[in-house]
Amino acid sequence: KIAIMPSPNNPTGNCFRPKDVEEILSRFNGIVVVDEAYAEYSDNPFVSRVEEFDNLVVLRTFSKAYAMAALRVGYAVSNKKLADMMICVKIPYSLNMISEGAAIAAVKDQDFVKRSVQMVREQRPILDSGLRKLGFETFPSDSNFILARSPIDHKVLVDGLKQRGVLIRDFGAKRRTENCIRTTVGTAEHNALLLEKAEEVISGCR
């Protein structure tokens, strides 16, 4: 049996509490996979604790903080016993040479990752505050995006922003994220543009 826990979660952006993950690890009779695709933006990664639990596997990716989504590079971290088991079932040649070379080069450029993550951490509360001032209900985020419930119809907002050259993700028709949108935390200039155009769309509905 395998239980998969995305932390930070997508699309909510929040992390599981460490004590909740620990409880699941201790009580679940199977392998617990914690997907930490967005972990660089959070404060509670579990990747350093794989030796504490005999049933923990942590997944990481180069698609987010390393900005290499097109190359489809990721990896798993676990204790040796689980790693040996995964190697037995891993498909051969799962990574091409171009992606492998790019990943090695990316690992050596930690300055880029640090700058990227720092920018998100600085801009995230600023964008969150700006959205709330426009009437959005924002959800706490440990990631590089913010989920927010729109003060107007989600389709009107998404379409209005698209007409103004701004693209956001629409989650408004999904269960439990009714009337919600998700926006990436960008640079100060990008975030200011989003807020400006969102205010235009919202004002046009009132």
Positions of the model-derived regions?
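PLP-dependent enzyme catalytic core of the Aspartate aminotransferase-like
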Residues: 19, 163-164, 173-206
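Active-site pre-lysine segment of PLP-dependent enzymes
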Residues: 11-65
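Short acidic/glycine-enriched loop/turn segments that link adjacent beta-strands
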Residues: 70, 142-143, 175-179
